[in-house]
Structure formats: C-alpha cells, structure tokens
Regions:
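Nucleotide-activated sugar donor-binding and catalytic core shared by glycosyltransferases
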Residues: 1-330
C-alpha cells in the first residue's frame, strides 16, 4: 500500500563515528530487514531520501537486483569521503540535489549529471500558518519580553550537552525570555532536569511557530540552522560533540563552515561556535551582537540573498515529476 510506514527513520539514525560503531549490530540488522522488505514489495523503482550511510548500502544491493534507483537529497560527499562518488556513479541512476553548489560539484568536478530542484524547506516554511506573537505568548504562558529561542537538537545525547551551555547564559539576559524548542519524539520530563532558571520556558512541536516570533536564536548545527535563517531569525550556531567523534571528523572533513547558511553563502553570515569555542563567555558575546541594529541589518540582507540562491518552491514536486518522467520514458 502506498505510503505505508514499515519502520521510522528515527529508529535507524545514529550520528557520529563512535555512535555508529557502538550500534553497528543494530544497523546491520536493519539493512537486512530493509532488503527483505523491498524484495517482498518488488518495486518498479526505488527512491532514496537522504540518510546516505544506510541508503547507499541498499542502493548497491538494489542495482544488483536491477531495480532503477533515484536519490533525492544527495549524500554530502562534498564535505567528506568524496571517494563515494564512485559508488554514486555506479549505483544511483538519477540524483536530485537541493543545495545550489552541489550541481557544480557533481557536474564540473565529477562529470556526473544531477538535477538541482531547490530546497524543500522553502515549501515547509511557505505552507505554515502565520502566527500572531501576542497570541503565541499568551497560549504558552509567556510575558511581553522578546524571545530568545533555544534549539538544542533532536537526540538526547546532543540535547543534554547543548542545553547545559545554552542555559548557562540565561541569568545575564533578564531583558529577554528563553524558550526551548522541544523535539517531538522527546517528552518534557527529559528537558525538565536541565531547567533550573525561572526565565526558561518550553514548547514542543512548535519550532516554526516559536522561531517566527523570536528575536534571536541559539541553534545546534544541522538543518535547523537553515530553518532559522529562512524564518528570518538572527542566530548563533552551536556545536559540541563527542570528543572522539569530533577529532576524527576534524581530520577528514574539509569544510570552511559547518552551518548550511554559511556553506550556501560561502561566507560567515552567522557565527559558528564549535567545540572548544562554545563557551559561556563567547556565547554571551555573540548573543549580545545579535541584539544590535547594525548587526541585525547585515544578517537580514544576507538572508534575502540566501533565499534567492536556494531557488523557488516546489522541490519535492519537481523531483516527483522528474522521477515520473523517467519511469514513463523507460
């Protein structure tokens, strides 16, 4: 049946070198389960969406079974393990990329044709309902002060590490109220043990609504950094990972920036505080910058250019149309 969820991707998601190693048995078991399920379903084509560590293994197997393969949201081989291009050329028949620089990367550097379809976040944000700031504050028991949104991530180990440092600066910003954006899959009781200040509030499943009425945000690196920018909120990007994973990554990942905002713009539009730089002192200084008119004006100008570079809306529809056309032609 179309649209049937066999297993949620959250059950399969492990990030970081150490985390993958310690969960290797579970990962291999899920790969075997996926192959059996695909064989039973017997699809005409196979469409992969993101999640390269898992999907590229399945893509290799699928090609051996002579199943046409389409990949939406490319593996980030421009960041690390560029040699994966060999597997992509071999196992992926059609690639649909969502970042503007990816098209040049694939076609100019590796002579592999891809389709740039725009970024699906543009649709997600455009389709959301407008939120009235006063109503949002009233419904969530907030006062009239400007909001600083805290986005500590989506996984427990990540949240625990990021919230500790984010909340350390609350007492120095009494003129603002801090609101944590809870991950939908994690209940309030997990967050509660970190909240000791009266000036800290919590909402769950309302991240876009929260950002749309926020004055500034502290955001854990990842897709949330781009979401925050597209909702026009000045931000500080934060990251502090497992010590082993971080130092391994530092040696093999060749990027000037970790946030999608800066990568797309190819300049430091938003400040990134990474690992040892993510301290209370630095976080306070950067948040103070976000409250100044001149700094905010420059950020907003760059956000306009960012949106233009991402192309128009309709990324998923364009991808679906391209896949359908390929199916009809073959």
């Amino acid at each position: 049946v179309a649209g049937t969820q066999v297993k949620h991707y959250r059950d399969l998601a492990f990030m970081g070198f150490w985390e993958v190693i310690t969960n290797l048995r579970t990962i291999l078991r899920n790969i075997d389960f996926c192959k059996k399920d695909i064989t039973q379903f017997n699809p005409d084509v196979l469409i992969f969406i993101d999640y390269p560590g898992f999907n590229m293994r399945i893509a290799q197997w699928a090609k051996q079974q002579h199943i046409p393969t389409h990949y939406y949201i490319s593996p980030q081989i421009w960041a690390w393990k560029e040699n994966r291009i060999k597997a992509i050329k071999r196992d992926v028949d059609f690639m649909y990329v969502i970042l503007p620089f990816e098209k040049d990367f694939y076609e100019r550097e590796h002579q592999y044709r891809v389709h740039f379809v725009g970024h699906p976040l543009l649709d997600a944000i455009a389709q959301r309902k407008e939120v009235d700031e006063q109503t949002f504050k009233k419904e969530n028991n907030l006062d009239v002060r400007p909001i600083i949104a805290l986005l500590p991530g989506s996984r427990k180990q990540e949240i625990a590490k990021m919230l500790k440092i984010m909340l350390s600066i609350v007492d120095d910003f009494h003129q603002y109220q801090f609101v944590i954006a809870g991950a939908p899959s994690i209940d309030y009781h997990f967050y509660k043990r970190f909240i000791k200040e009266e000036n800290v509030h919590f909402v769950s499943g309302k991240t876009y609504d929260l950002l749309s009425v926020s004055y500034a945000a502290l955001v854990t690196s990842g897709t949330a950094t781009l979401e925050t920018a597209l909702l026009n909120v000045p931000e500080v990007v934060c990251y502090k990972g497992n010590w082993i994973s971080y130092h391994i990554a530092k040696r093999i990942i060749k990027l000037k920036y970790i946030s999608l905002v800066n990568l797309i713009m190819d300049k430091p539009v938003v400040t990134e505080l990474i690992q040892g730089d993510l301290t209370k002192k630095n976080l306070e200084a950067e948040l103070n910058k976000l409250t100044t008119y001149r700094h905010r004006y420059e950020v907003f100008k760059d956000y306009v250019l960012l949106r233009e570079r991402l192309g128009g809306e309709g990324a998923s529809e364009k991808t679906a149309s391209l896949i359908l056309r390929q199916c009809q032609e073959n």
